[in-house]
Amino acid sequence: MIRIGYRPDWEQFEYRTMDKNYWKAVQYTLLIMYEKGLIYRKKFPVHWCSKCGTALSQAEVGYIQKRGKLYYIKFRITDNEFIEIATTRPELLSACVAIAINPNDERYKNLIGKEVEVPIFGNKVRVLEDNAVDPNFGTGIVMICTYGDEQDIRWQQRYNLPIIPVINEEGKIINSGKYSGMSVIEARKEIVEDLRKLGLITREEEILHNILVHIERSDCMTPIEFIVKDQWFIKSKDFKEEIIEEEEKMNWIPKYMKQRLLEWINNIEWDWVISRQRIFGTPIPFWYCEDCGFIIPPKKEQLPVDTIKDKPPINSCPKCGSNKISGTSDVCDCWVDSSITPLIITRFFEDKTFFNRTYPVDLRQQGHDIIRTWLYYTILRCKIITEVGPFKNVVINGHILGPDGTRMSKSKGNVIMPEEGIEKYGADALRQALLSLTLGSDFPFKWEPVRHGKSFLQKIWSSVRFASQFMMNGEKKINITQLNDIDKWILAKLRNTIAIVDDAMEKYQFHIAVEMLKQFYWHDFCDQYIEAIKPRLYSPISQDDKDNVEAILYKIIWIFIRLLNPICPHIAEEIYHRLFKEREGYISINIAPYPSLDEVPEVDGNNGEKLVDIIASLRSKKVENRMALSALVKKAIIQESKEIIELCKRNEWLLKEVLHINEIEYKEGRREITLIN
């Protein structure tokens, strides 16, 4: 981080989520939320990852597409009458507690109120009507299992259906006769084989379907099961409107990312499961009564607590009188910890004066992949605790992908380490290339922009070395009365650059700032202005004119390196120490004031723009005639408008010196340039 120029204020704002003081802060916020009636514990079907062995929140899971099979299975109504149900999960047959059809599906009106026998297991279940059934999927009939997906949970609660758990925490089948103890995949294979033998599978279709997986961890991606477990929850569904209100107040960069959070909030169906069955983490800071479930909070002065090791503040349950009080081995979801970072850095817990001065914080910068976790949970928790949203600005960045356009992964061999770019091209070239990308979008990593960035840095260095021969000669101020047309042009360009770069940086449009700085310094300053002033430095028409040019050089480079500093801090700091520190007096360029328009005289650069255009045309004509730019031209005939001819005559000495022309002849008319040797 140091090598690439990343230097936050570690001394004031560093924190570690594994420290006891951080645990204390996390537990205190949970105590606040408990006192507001927002923490509860209950049995509920939760998203469960059998590989990680823990419950997950809705934000940690997501759908991926995989190939699979859709099995059409016969369910018996009477001895000679069957219906067909299509499912991708025949291993859940033992958990089937009902059959559902769409009430508008005329094909199955006769089934309403009947019972259907579940194949292999023989239990009978009733037929329900529900509008959520898709009549176009499979046969239009679905089996309701406990639990195959979120829809099964909704139906179970809506119709008060029985619960038959058939998958345990290890991902093994239970309560399913001879299939018990098998993995989900093994049980599916065996049940399908038995159904085939019984003639109960009528057809099998290869399909591409969505599977719910543990998507937050790319090294997991295990299919999710729904397991009924005692878990700890925060009431989050109740705060949808408040969170939407807060996100509307924030300045989003890019603006369209706000929609992602909005869509997530509107799709939240369950309260936040905050407990995790892991070894390490912030302990859930509550005890509970084993008999009635009453929650017993710690006293504030007890924090931090580990309820497995520490004694509760009371010996018996205040609700039922039982002395069976237990702690919990569960730890907090990591987002419970991370969601209070704005409170940590603004010292909410220990310095209210500092907190009131610094909260809400200016900026949250993060990736788009954790909008629905870190960002959402931070807004939720901070809003509940402080009654104010945590951020003024939210900047969402994309990901740098591998050169092949896919996510970087060691297994794919497409990982680009920052050290490689720093060693080869320098940190500033790498920073420049990355800041040239548009915020919010993912980009495959390419070396070409880094190489181009290094070329720009080399251009800066060589131009500064040239200019340093002249611009350090004594204290000089720009004399506005002695500016010629091309001086006015470069100063007008400089003012425009300051304005555009400042505006772009304020709006976090770093790619615009990078492009503008390149355009000004490389093309306007180096390619045009420096080439145009060389005769005035080497063969000055007067000492006053030379002094003015040197003052302009000083002004431009001093302003430019301060504009460049946030993007390329290493070269900016180096140039500052070599050329400017003694005169300007700041210990570092980072302490120097950011450039303002007040530093540059306001002048009209229009004539200079036209003059630069003429110079460019003369150069192009040399190239067209296969002449070196330094080759001597006997005579140039410039055909132009009267206005441009007058401009050229005023600057004829400059044109002759810069373009190595002996004589210039002028004609009125449409632009045409002729070179005669």
Task: Give the location of each predicted region.
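Conserved oxyanion/phosphate-binding beta-strand-loop segments in alpha/beta enzyme cores
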Residues: 1, 105-132, 161, 222-245, ...
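Protease-associated
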Residues: 78, 83-144, 149-154
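Residue patterns forming the tRNA-binding/recognition surfaces of aminoacyl-tRNA synthetases
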Residues: 1-82, 137-291, 374, 406, ...
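A short glycine/serine-rich beta->alpha loop
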Residues: 358-369
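Feature 926 captures the class I aminoacyl-tRNA synthetase adenylation module centered on the KMSKS loop
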Residues: 72, 267-336, 340, 384-427, ...
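Short hydrophobic-aromatic micro-motifs
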Residues: 83-87, 92-101, 141-144, 224-226, ...
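Auxiliary tRNA-acceptor-end handling modules of aminoacyl-tRNA synthetases
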Residues: 88, 213, 222, 228, ...
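Metal-dependent nuclease catalytic cores in nucleic-acid-processing enzymes
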Residues: 150-159, 192, 371-387, 615-623
